[in-house]
From Swiss-Prot:
GO terms for cellular component: cytosolic large ribosomal subunit. Belongs to the eukaryotic ribosomal protein eL42 family. GO terms for molecular function: structural constituent of ribosome. It holds the Pfam family Ribosomal_L44. PANTHER family: 60S RIBOSOMAL PROTEIN L36A/L44 (PTHR10369). This is Large ribosomal subunit protein eL42. GO terms for biological process: translation. Keywords: Ribonucleoprotein, Ribosomal protein. InterPro entries: Ribosomal_eL44, Ribosomal_LSU_eL42, Ribosomal_zn-bd.
Length: 106
């Protein structure tokens, strides 16, 4: 299990800062896919009408986890950057710290 604190002191690339400052940490989440992207428009046009499924649907999934991406926002200048972590099954943001002799809880 990976437990990350909600704030982190790290280097800020913003023009005002360019030094180590406090950053607010959140987990990156993919945005909603646009209906007007060229690939989606082409796919919808091809799918319309008779003839069933026209493109292959991918089934051979190989990975069991995704890489965790952190979104760091500078508290002073509000510049945002992303930081990729390694793959993990359990990810927690701002959870309780581990204590010695305690059982793991999911």
């Amino acid at each position: 299990m990976v437990n990350i604190p909600k704030t982190r002191n790290t280097y800020c690339k913003g023009k005002e800062c360019r030094k180590h400052t406090q950053h607010k940490v959140t987990q990156y989440k993919a945005g909603k896919a646009s209906l007007y992207a060229q690939g989606k428009r082409r796919y919808d046009r091809k799918q319309s009408g008779y003839g069933g499924q026209t493109k292959q649907i991918f089934h051979k999934k190989a990975k069991t986890t995704k890489k965790v991406v952190l979104r760091l926002e500078c508290v002073k200048c509000k510049v945002k950057m992303q930081l990729a972590l390694k793959r993990c099954k359990h990810f927690e943001l701002g959870g309780d710290k581990k204590q010695k002799g305690q059982a793991l809880q999911f």
